[in-house]
Amino acid sequence: MLKRASFVEVNTHSLRHNFNAVKNIVPKDACVMAVVKANAYGAGAIKASEIFLQEGANYLGVATLDEALELRSHFSQTPILILGYSPNTNASMLIDNDLSAMVFSLEQAEVFSQMALKSQKRLKVHLKIDTGMHRLGLEPTFKSIETIKKIRALKGLEVEGIFTHLSNADSNIKTHAKNQMKVFNAFLEQLLDQKIEFQYRHAYNSAGILSLCNGNENRLLNLYRPGIMLYGFYPSNEMKESSQTILKNVISLKARIVQIKRVKKGEFIGYGEHFYTNEETLVGVLALGYADGLVRALGNRIQVAINNQLAPLIGKVCMDQCFVKLNDIEAKEGDEVILFGDKSTKANDASEIATLLNTIPYETISTLSKRLERVYV
């Protein structure tokens, strides 16, 4: 029984299909880290992780300690890597919950080592290398090799992996991505020359998986990190047009009509004066708003699907509610409205919503609030 008249519908068959699409692309003996940060990009981290693990995921990737702890409470043995920054104050929680952390400096590693020794436990870490995104990471230099030697010598740490992140493998021109991999591979080879090896070596996100697995740039990799493609979206429109891989929509934002009102001509609907009734208007009120992840700016800009018909979203989206115009639409209170989802329903998909808002589908789906229940079908 749903507690609200709005929800996120998650297609579990599509989750399985998309994960297996990854498995069909990466090398047969490769490991896969399913990235389930931001509540699995809106799909619900626990259920999505359960499905990915059933389908053969070897590792789960998140961005924050809280996300990792939520997963650990359900998956006691599964390897979980926090891909984002972990403050030194989180060290004891990382150790006590057998979580893996990203490390990018000797100072950070020393703190983690000290805490691990106090706990008489070991903390697994993955070293982040900055090959050209210029976010977090050690520079791929001789000096960093010396730093890595010092980190590996610290007691209490298990330096399990090394990785980098590709910044624009989703573009048509792969020069920068290939240059990043050239730098990363050269650095790995320099480390190997000094007998420094890692259980896991990873770099490819969804864009890398979809576009760079046919060359030899990934020859030293053995772990792959799919994110957005698991949830049915290509990293860019360019990739959608060029990819041979079929991905299936996972997430639909839905609500039910909670009241239908007949509003006379000459009235304004909702806050401000953003929709004027130039005729008698049937207005359907939905219990869904921008606090749920339906962007306020979508008012008066999109059509939604009701009983296989298209109806305009009118007025400004409120924090908890919004309006649809039902003139010439067969609808009644309680009927389902699809704000975005599978194209077969006539609704926009999240990619089209993102284009309208001059953003990317990552943002459209990952900002869907946790106060919306997830319904798995």
Swiss-Prot record:
It comes from Helicobacter pylori (strain J99 / ATCC 700824). One of its GO terms (cellular component) is cytosol. Substrate binds at residues 135, 319. This is Alanine racemase. InterPro entries: Ala_racemase, Ala_racemase/Decarboxylase_C, Ala_racemase_C, Ala_racemase_N, Ala_racemase_pyridoxalP-BS, PLP-binding_barrel. One of its GO terms (biological process) is D-alanine biosynthetic process. Its cofactor is pyridoxal 5'-phosphate. PROSITE patterns: ALANINE_RACEMASE. Belongs to the alanine racemase family. Catalyzes the interconversion of L-alanine and D-alanine. May also act on other amino acids. Keywords: Isomerase, Pyridoxal phosphate. Pfam families: Ala_racemase_C, Ala_racemase_N. Pathway: Amino-acid biosynthesis; D-alanine biosynthesis; D-alanine from L-alanine: step 1/1. It catalyses: L-alanine = D-alanine. The modification N6-(pyridoxal phosphate)lysine is found at residue 37. GO terms for molecular function: alanine racemase activity; pyridoxal phosphate binding.
